[in-house]
């Protein structure tokens, strides 16, 4: 794991040294001295705009021979227009620096920050750079037995010199804790589905949360049947692996404080059931539990900080498999709420899992606010691509706050519509509702949201986050490799911290 230290004295032993320069291409007094030590390499580089323009995110790595004859590397990072810098951009810059250092096989990095940059103190700026680098250091290669030497290389340490290392270290410690929660979310999402069965996943939740003071209850199929969870159980009945409902309760606030409930879809593997998916890219359905992973990761982050709030998490863990015992198109299930649902398509299973999970959360904990998170529909990816998750809500203030925080942490949300006409599209001739709409291909994400909305009680503020397009990526980003993104943890952690 990447080691990040904050120090009061500069070290001359680091292999790489990071220099920040904005689009004005001016050297302050500190950089002038450093430039002289390195034979004017910094000033020569920025004078040649074909090499370096100072635009945001531009990284230039230059080898330099110091007086001792040793080779050092100057890592010049562009800030662009300092007035346009945001916390998210600074974190991403930290990730880019780590990735370039890794590519150049630079094992130790030094970074000096003693001046305010734009509106950010040196301590805040340094902690954000460190956070981005730490997030970018994530790897999932536990099943690789033949890694090449280049693939094995990792930056060992980053040493950051600021004018108040103690304060900077405190700021980073919180960000590191949140990043480690993101790593859990990525890890469990990246795990192959033959490894992370509902039972194994539930055990991992217990192992990581109970030491943090979170009460965890793992409910099996017998108890779910007694509770009347016909919708969730119907999804999992085709699998030989028993479905689980995992309930997490963190009581950091006072007894009379309101509770927020997070509910996650945890379809461990989704074949589509009898309504079988095409085989192409079906392996990616191991990520169909990304919503549940985001919920667990958020509770790790909240409990790890010992935040003074009350929060519960409920995740339904199932496998949607075809078999002689699998749910059939046309089946009618009775949900925990007592409402019935006609299952017209067994591949619209996530909303069935959430129906019972959100109802359970409301019945047991009486939350003021429910936020469900799910890789729910392919339609949201058609609408928003891989840039935004969809946000549906019955409360404008709740939606606005979530969207604002999403912009701040670069886990973006786009408000999607709810309307009575969408709701009418899920009426069934033989049950209270159907699990798909009556107009093929129309408003798929909105239809799914309305299905869940029918299980939200009057007076409860609710938001549904459809993260199907952003939970995993087929390409690396500044903050991590391709695969599971860990989307939702930083968004929900900050929302909870600031607004509850």
Swiss-Prot record:
Localization, per the record, is: Cytoplasm
Free-text comment on the cofactor: Binds 2 manganese ions per subunit.
Quote the Gene3D superfamilies the UniProt record gives.
Answer: Leucine Aminopeptidase, subunit E, domain 1, Zn peptidases
Query: Would you say which domain of life the source belongs to?
Result: Bacteria
Q: Which reaction does this enzyme catalyse, per its entry?
A: Release of an N-terminal amino acid, Xaa-|-Yaa-, in which Xaa is preferably Leu, but may be other amino acids including Pro although not Arg or Lys, and Yaa may be Pro. Amino acid amides and methyl esters are also readily hydrolyzed, but rates on arylamides are exceedingly low; Release of an N-terminal amino acid, preferentially leucine, but not glutamic or aspartic acids
Q: Which InterPro entries match?
A: Leucine_aapep/pepB, Macro_dom-like, Peptidase_M17_C, Peptidase_M17_leu_NH2_pept, Peptidase_M17_N
Q: Which UniProt keywords apply?
A: Aminopeptidase, Cytoplasm, Hydrolase, Manganese, Metal-binding, Protease
Binding of Mn(2+) 1: at which residues? 270, 347, 349
The record places the active site at 277, 351
Entry function: Presumably involved in the processing and regular turnover of intracellular proteins. Catalyzes the removal of unsubstituted N-terminal amino acids from various peptides.
Protein name, per record: Probable cytosol aminopeptidase
């Amino acid at each position: 794991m990447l080691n990040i230290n904050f120090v009061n004295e500069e070290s001359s032993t680091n292999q790489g040294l990071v220099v920040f320069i904005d689009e004005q291409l001016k050297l302050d007094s500190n950089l002038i001295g450093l430039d002289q030590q390195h034979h004017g390499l910094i000033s020569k580089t920025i004078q040649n705009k074909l090499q370096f323009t100072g635009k945001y995110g531009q990284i230039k790595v230059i080898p330099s021979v110091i007086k001792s004859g040793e080779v050092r590397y100057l890592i010049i990072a562009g800030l662009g227009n300092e007035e346009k810098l945001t916390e998210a951009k600074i974190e991403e810059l930290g990730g880019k620096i780590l990735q370039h250092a890794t590519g150049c096989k630079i094992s130790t990095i030094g970074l000096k920050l003693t001046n305010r940059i734009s509106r950010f103190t040196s301590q805040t700026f340094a902690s954000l750079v460190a956070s981005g680098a730490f997030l970018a250091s994530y790897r999932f290669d536990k099943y690789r037995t033949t890694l090449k030497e280049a693939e094995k290389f990792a930056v060992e340490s980053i040493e950051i010199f600021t004018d108040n290392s103690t304060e900077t270290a405190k700021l980073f410690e919180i960000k590191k804790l949140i990043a480690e929660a993101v790593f859990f979310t990525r890890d469990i999402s990246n795990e192959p589905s033959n490894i992370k069965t509902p039972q194994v996943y539930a055990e991992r939740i217990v192992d990581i949360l109970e030491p943090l003071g979170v009460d965890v209850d793992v409910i099996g199929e017998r108890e779910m049947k007694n509770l009347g969870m016909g919708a969730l159980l119907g999804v999992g009945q085709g699998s030989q692996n028993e479905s689980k409902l995992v309930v997490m309760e963190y009581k950091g606030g006072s007894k009379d404080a309101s509770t927020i409930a997070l509910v996650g879809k945890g379809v461990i593997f989704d074949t589509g059931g009898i309504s079988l998916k095409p085989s192409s890219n079906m392996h990616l359905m191991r990520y169909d539990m990304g919503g549940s992973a985001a919920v667990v990761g958020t509770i790790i982050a909240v409990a790890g900080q010992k935040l003074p709030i009350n929060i519960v998490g409920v995740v339904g863990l199932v496998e949607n498999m075809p078999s002689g015992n699998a749910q059939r198109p046309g089946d009618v299930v009775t949900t925990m709420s007592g409402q019935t649902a006609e299952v017209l398509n067994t591949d619209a299973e996530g909303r069935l899992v959430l129906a019972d999970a959100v109802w359970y959360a409301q019945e047991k904990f009486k939350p003021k606010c429910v936020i469900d998170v799910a890789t729910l529909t392919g339609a949201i990816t058609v609408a928003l691509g891989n840039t935004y998750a969809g946000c549906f809500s019955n409360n404008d203030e709740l939606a606005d706050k979530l969207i604002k925080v999403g912009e701040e942490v670069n886990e973006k949300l786009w408000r999607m519509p709810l309307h009575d006409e969408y709701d009418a599209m899920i009426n069934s001739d033989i049950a209270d509702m159907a699990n798909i709409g009556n107009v093929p291909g129309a408003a798929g994400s909105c239809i799914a949201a309305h299905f869940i909305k029918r299980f939200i009680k009057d007076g409860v503020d609710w938001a549904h986050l459809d993260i199907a397009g952003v939970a995993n990526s087929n390409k690396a980003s500044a903050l991590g490799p391709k695969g599971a993104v860990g989307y939702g943890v930083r968004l929900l952690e900050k929302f909870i911290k600031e607004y509850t």
